[in-house]
Amino acid sequence: MDGRQLYRVADVMHLLSMSRSVIYEQIRSGRLRSVKQGRTRLIPASAITDYITLLEQEARKL
């Protein structure tokens, strides 16, 4: 990540190699935290890190 604190959904799509619909699905399910600023959905850098950690933990359980 490039030092920003908040990322747009389009940026997170590229960072995580996921589609827009999957990103929003993860947000709805509570697995990926986000905030809303006006009409824009933003994802904190810490939420991205937490989500990656969650994926790694789930992968270890398999």
List each model region and its residues.
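Polyanion-binding surface elements
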Residues: 1-22, 53-54
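Major-groove DNA-recognition helix of helix-turn-helix-type DNA-binding domains
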Residues: 16-42
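A short, Lys/Arg-enriched interface patch at domain edges and termini
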Residues: 48-62
